[in-house]
């Protein structure tokens, strides 16, 4: 039986590209997202391998819906926590509690409690967090996003410790700055709320954003081809040249 992957945030950007990449590699994929039209667009490119689930990872009903989508008798091999929100970009002095809680619900609670529900289904499998440089570097205006990504990084570290004696491995990757709808929104934010705005405009204008398909190659290599001890040992960074020869030419 083919291996099974669950990918959240699979309607666009990195999640969509990774879904298609794994499907090409003969992996069955449950593609999860909130917008059904985006998911259907993803599924049309490989309907034999891709099953879609419209669900919000930020609430328990959505997470339970994902769990129930696993076909009977099929073992979950890969769980990729890609879904995330960045909006609104606003100083912490002005963020409201509802927006703050949405960041925590989707970016932190979603990965934690979906992992918790799926642990019994992951036999000898791998869990991967899609992290961000924002977890390690503060940007004015990204307070809610940065703190949620920092929490996600710590979840990776703690789960790695707690699962070290099991047959489940957990990893984390930093995909760099990627040409996704999230980046489109970032460039529309007023500079008064996001002082680093021009940096991100320049990256786009200078063609320095990575294509989601390139990032998907990187992630699929980590998921499918690295050894267990390598997979969990550190947070992988796409910009680290030491590993690029193993996946960039594929």
Where are these regions (language model features)?
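Conserved glycine-rich cofactor-binding loop
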Residues: 11-12
